[in-house]
């Protein structure tokens, strides 16, 4: 009976996917159909509702929507642009600096927002036109953006470790966050090495005027609030001041305060 139920579940799931039903609805529908077929209809519906409620009844998983909201606030508040300016300031006229800026921006933005897709969209949306203006190969620009987008899923703070902790039965979130630093930074560094070698080979060097001390200080000052968020979240979790879920709420409040203090930068999220 278990084998038959598994077969029905798989067939219904892929059949719904073939008709372009969203994955989440396909999972729910396939599970519900399987339960109804192998249990009484009333009991199957009851079990489905109970499992859905208990499945999301997790204080730890509550951090995920908060980190998603934090990512939306970052995408719509000019924070991505400030991180890009800081990365460009540091990298300067290094060969392949625009692609390296894209990679560094994805790492910083993705770690704060917890979303590789949000990082690729926000950072890539700003960097792609700049790279095109400097004569970068479009395929190379897209590859640098896509390859570095998931880096933020390893560099803390990131919601993926929180989900893993909840699914694995309570692995220490603090330990996971600290363990993500080395592979995340190594991934970003290797991507930047490839961008440097490719940029040097093809002569991808940006031309810009000499930066004044005022511009340098302003760029650093604008990026400090965004970078300080990492210090608040990681420091708060490791010091025990708040849990990862509470840290996600603090991130939302902190970003909201940044937007309130600079209302001209804030774009309403529809």
Please report, for each region that a protein language model flagged, where it lies by residue.
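Membrane-interfacial amphipathic/re-entrant helices at transmembrane-helix boundaries
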Residues: 2-7, 39-56, 204-223
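Hydrophobic mid-bilayer segments of alpha-helices in multi-pass membrane transport proteins
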Residues: 4-14, 21-40, 62-69, 185-191, ...
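Transmembrane helix boundary and interhelical junction motifs in multipass membrane proteins
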Residues: 22-28, 80-83, 114-124, 154-161, ...
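Membrane-embedded alpha-helical segments and adjacent helix-loop junctions characteristic
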Residues: 41-132
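Alpha-helical membrane-interface segments at transmembrane helix boundaries
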Residues: 49-58, 88-92, 174-178, 182, ...
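Alpha-helical transmembrane segments of multi-pass membrane proteins
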Residues: 64, 96-110, 134-151, 176, ...
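Juxtamembrane and boundary regions of transmembrane helices in multi-pass small-molecule transporters
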Residues: 168-171, 175-211
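Single conserved hydrophobic/aromatic residue that forms the stacking wall/gate
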Residues: 258-270
């Amino acid at each position: 009976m278990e084998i038959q139920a598994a077969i029905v579940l798989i067939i219904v799931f892929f059949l719904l996917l073939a008709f372009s039903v969203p994955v989440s609805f396909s999972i729910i529908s396939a599970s519900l159909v399987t339960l109804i077929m192998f249990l009484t209809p009333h009991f199957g519906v009851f079990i489905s509702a109970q499992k859905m409620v208990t499945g999301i009844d997790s204080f730890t998983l509550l951090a995920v929507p908060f980190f998603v909201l934090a990512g939306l606030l970052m995408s719509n508040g000019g924070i991505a642009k400030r991180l890009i300016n800081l990365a460009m300031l540091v990298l300067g006229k290094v060969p392949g600096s625009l692609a390296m800026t894209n990679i560094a921006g994805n790492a910083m933005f993705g770690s704060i927002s917890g979303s590789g897709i949000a990082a690729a969209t926000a950072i890539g949306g700003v960097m792609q036109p700049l790279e095109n203006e400097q004569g970068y190969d479009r395929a190379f620009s897209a590859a640098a953006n896509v390859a570095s987008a998931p880096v933020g899923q390893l560099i803390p703070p990131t919601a993926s470790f929180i989900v893993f902790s909840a699914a694995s039965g309570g692995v220490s979130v603090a330990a996971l966050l600290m363990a993500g630093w080395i592979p995340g930074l190594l991934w970003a560094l290797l991507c930047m090495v490839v961008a440097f070698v490719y940029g040097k080979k093809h002569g991808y060097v940006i031309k810009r005027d000499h930066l004044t001390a005022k511009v340098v200080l302003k760029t650093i000052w604008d990026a400090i609030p965004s970078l300080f968020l990492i210090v608040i979240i990681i420091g708060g979790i490791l010091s025990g001041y708040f849990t990862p879920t509470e840290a996600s709420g603090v991130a939302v409040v902190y970003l909201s305060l940044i937007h309130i203090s600079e209302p001209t930068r804030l774009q309403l999220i529809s």
